[in-house]
């Protein structure tokens, strides 16, 4: 900006300001590098000139343009760090109406509603022009909070959280843009400032207010794309707040039960994921569920509405009669639509991962939630097992080959990505009720060996402390029973018969020579640090050997001890 334009801004020449700011804002709309503004203190002079205009109430019609310029200037981290801007930040907080030095927020949304009813005549609905100014000021504050720790602390000192939360919880309707940037600012503060999370959750009871607001949003007959964006930002804020709960366990669990019920309604409403935005809402809801206590996830599956009205029909002579369903997605008298949404989301995420070779960020949260559901409730585990590990029929292919959920999860068992590998292993193991034999049946010992080594059950011992119902869920199909004897437990499938065994044509001397060569090759790999030969110790975990020949001494004794145990 040339000196003449800057001088006119400093002189607050109203007739020239709109053209000057319009030209500047268009020219620098995408500016990210401000090196040219650092010479001759140009950034600071322009900053002060703009805030001089913002301080003049008579130039209120220019404030939206001025704030657009401020938003551009707040991208310059260097200038924000090297100039004293506390007064200007206070001015932005005032323009955004999030400065609340003496605000007292009621403990619950109901108390706030009563307070608003008593002050109905004192409330002032912002005009459209004022709402635009508030939204632009919020955009500037978002940039400042992202760039500067000092600005974040100033926002907390001036009770910015209190004011935003009161506006969110107010019965007064606000434009979507204003609500969106309220949530964006709240997200940045809670993501970057731990003290903000603590204050929002403990001092302001923010989770209760935000849960109520989310519930109100879902009660509306339709949701525009702008409303879906707001819901996404709100879910992100709630994720930050619940990441490290500081409330007492009982108090937090009561809030979590209510929140889980609201998230259930959200998943049911947007579970079809008809648009990318609806899919984003489901993604953020699943992320939030990862922070919810396992004991609260029972709220995802309510009793079917007419389950109690179903007549009890005793079927004599039929040991495994299926209970009558009272609705389309009723399983053991519980509505499992939410679990169906989670499984559909998992299938879509798996398809996306294969098509785009994307990261595992979409898969880890939904697998975490499925693990927690499986561990927390018998009915949920039964349903997930039915969908993920149905009774085996085709055992001609390895478990990791195919496009079913079981096949995908078995492939994850041998991934180098530890988080995804461990989550897939835990989900499958829990669905197998932590039964080693059942896990081998569905995955093959080779795929599950990593889990067994980690758990200390390589020798297929029973897992201690596993607490599951004694009812049998495992019914072998006729196809499985037919081929059961021919299944290779290491591969997890029927091993194709070899046309010719090369050892058949060897003499005993040749076999011994081949065995010695194999020993030498394994020893070379061991010396190079590529492999580590091991035996299973008394704890069921692999114990490295100093030399490959130790196998010759230790293995027969270990096999003898294993036979005695069985």
Curated annotation (Swiss-Prot):
Annotated InterPro entries: ARM-like, ARM-type_fold, Chaperone_Ric-8_A/B, Gua_nucleotide_exch_fac_Ric8
GO cellular component: a single term: cell cortex
Coiled-coil region(s): none
Chief site of localization: cytoplasm
Location within or outside the cell: Cytoplasm, Cell cortex; Presynapse; Cytoplasm
Keywords: Cell projection, Chaperone, Cytoplasm, Developmental protein, Guanine-nucleotide releasing factor, Synapse
Function: Chaperone that specifically binds and folds some, but not all, nascent G alpha proteins prior to G protein heterotrimer formation, promoting their stability and activity. Also acts as a guanine nucleotide exchange factor (GEF) for G alpha proteins by stimulating exchange of bound GDP for free GTP. Plays a key role in asymmetric spindle positioning, a step for asymmetric cell division that generates cell diversity during development by activating G(i) alpha protein independently of G-protein coupled receptors. Required during gastrulation and sensory organ precursor (SOP) formation.
Family indicated by similarity: Belongs to the synembryn family.
The protein's name in its UniProt record: Chaperone Ric-8
Origin organism lineage: Eukaryota, Metazoa, Ecdysozoa, Arthropoda, Hexapoda
UniProt gene name: ric8a
């Amino acid at each position: 900006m040339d000196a003449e334009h800057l001088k006119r801004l400093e002189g607050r020449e109203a007739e020239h300001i709109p053209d000057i700011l319009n030209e500047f804002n268009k020219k620098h709309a995408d500016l990210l590098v401000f090196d040219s503004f650092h010479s001759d203190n140009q950034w600071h002079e322009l900053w002060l000139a703009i805030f001089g205009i913002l301080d003049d109430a008579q130039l209120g019609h220019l404030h939206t343009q001025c704030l657009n310029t401020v938003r551009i200037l707040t991208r310059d981290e260097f200038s924000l760090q090297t100039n004293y801007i506390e007064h200007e930040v206070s001015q932005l907080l005032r323009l955004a109406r999030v400065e609340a030095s003496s605000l007292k927020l009621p403990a619950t949304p109901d108390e706030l509603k009563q307070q608003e009813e008593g002050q109905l005549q004192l409330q002032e609905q912002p005009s459209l022009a004022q709402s635009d100014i508030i939204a632009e000021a919020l955009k500037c504050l978002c940039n400042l909070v992202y760039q500067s720790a000092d600005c974040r602390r100033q926002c907390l000192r001036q009770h910015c959280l209190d004011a935003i939360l009161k506006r969110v919880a107010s019965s007064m309707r606000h434009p979507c843009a204003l609500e969106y940037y309220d949530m964006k600012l709240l997200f940045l503060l809670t993501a970057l400032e731990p003290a903000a999370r603590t204050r929002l959750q403990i001092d302001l009871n923010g989770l209760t207010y935000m849960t109520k607001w989310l519930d109100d949003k879902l009660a509306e007959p339709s949701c525009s794309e702008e409303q879906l964006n707001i819901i996404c930002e709100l879910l992100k804020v709630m994720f930050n707040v619940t990441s490290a709960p500081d409330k007492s366990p009982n108090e937090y669990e009561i809030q979590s039960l209510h929140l889980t019920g609201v998230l259930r309604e959200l998943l049911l409403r947007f579970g079809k994921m008809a648009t990318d935005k609806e899919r984003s809402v489901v993604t953020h809801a699943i992320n939030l569920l990862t922070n919810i206590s396992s004991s609260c996830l029972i709220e995802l599956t309510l009793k079917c509405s007419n389950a109690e009205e179903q007549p009890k029909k005793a079927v004599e002579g039929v040991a495994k009669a299926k209970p009558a369903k009272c609705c389309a997605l009723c399983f053991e008298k519980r509505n499992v639509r939410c679990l169906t949404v989670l499984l559909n989301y998992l299938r879509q995420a798996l398809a996306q991962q294969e098509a785009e070779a994307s990261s595992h960020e979409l898969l880890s949260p939904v697998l975490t939630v499925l693990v927690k559901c499986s561990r927390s409730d018998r009915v949920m585990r039964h349903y997930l097992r039915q969908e993920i590990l149905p009774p085996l029929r085709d055992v001609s292919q390895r478990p990791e080959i195919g496009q079913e959920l079981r096949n995908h999860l078995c492939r994850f068992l041998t991934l180098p990505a530890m988080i995804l590998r461990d989550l897939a292993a835990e989900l499958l193991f829990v669905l197998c009720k932590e039964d080693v034999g059942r896990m081998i049946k569905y995955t093959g010992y080779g795929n599950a060996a990593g889990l067994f080594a980690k758990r200390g059950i390589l020798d297929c011992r029973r897992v201690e402390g596993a607490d599951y119902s004694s009812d049998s869920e495992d019914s072998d199909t006729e196809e499985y029973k037919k081929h059961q004897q021919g299944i290779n437990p290491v591969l997890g499938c029927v091993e194709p018969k070899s046309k010719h065994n090369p050892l058949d044509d060897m003499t005993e001397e040749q076999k011994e020579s081949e065995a010695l060569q194999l020993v030498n090759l394994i020893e070379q790999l061991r010396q190079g640090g590529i492999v580590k030969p091991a035996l299973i110790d008394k704890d069921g975990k692999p114990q490295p050997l100093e030399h490959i020949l130790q196998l010759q001494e230790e293995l027969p004794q270990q096999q003898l001890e294993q036979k005695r145990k069985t």
